[in-house]
């Protein structure tokens, strides 16, 4: 039996893992002739379902973390530039004007 199947993340499939392991240990000919295939198919289905559930949970957790990080960034930006980043908007406009003026001066020479 694969050691990764005994992991905590597949705890929901423990019954299927034990059933397949028991079938494999009973009689060797059952294993050879594929008489344990029903147990194996059930285990594969359970593992796939468990894996999908783990992926869904991970996506949800990452979205929650991302939203929290973005809230923190917005709070830091508001502390630095004021509400709705008004100061940043003004500074960006002034920077754009200066850059345009310097470009115009360079082009006129």
Swiss-Prot record:
Asked if the Swiss-Prot or TrEMBL record annotates the protein with the keyword Cell membrane, the reply is: no
Task: Drop me one GO molecular function for this one.
Answer: metal ion binding
Q: Name one Pfam family in it.
A: Cmc1
Residue span(s) of domain CHCH: 10-54
Superkingdom per UniProt: Eukaryota
Membrane topology summary: Peripheral membrane protein
Could you give the domain comment from the record? Answer: The twin Cx9C motifs are involved in the recognition by the mitochondrial MIA40-ERV1 disulfide relay system and the subsequent transfer of disulfide bonds by dithiol/disulfide exchange reactions to the newly imported protein.
Functional note? Required for mitochondrial cytochrome c oxidase (COX) assembly and respiration. May be involved in copper trafficking and distribution to mitochondrial COX and SOD1.
Q: What is this protein called?
A: COX assembly mitochondrial protein 2
Write down the species.
Answer: Saccharomyces cerevisiae (strain ATCC 204508 / S288c) (Baker's yeast)
């Amino acid at each position: 039996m694969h050691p990764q199947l005994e992991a905590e993340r597949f705890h929901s499939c423990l019954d299927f893992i034990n059933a397949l392991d028991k079938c494999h240990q009973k009689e060797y000919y059952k294993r050879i002739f594929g008489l344990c295939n029903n147990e194996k198919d059930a285990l594969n289905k359970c593992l796939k379902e468990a894996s999908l559930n783990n992926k869904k949970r991970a996506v949800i957790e990452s979205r929650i973390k991302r939203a929290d990080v973005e809230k923190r960034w917005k709070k830091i930006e508001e502390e630095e530039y004021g509400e709705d980043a008004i100061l940043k908007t003004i500074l960006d406009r002034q920077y754009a004007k200066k850059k345009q003026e310097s470009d115009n001066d360079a082009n006129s020479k």
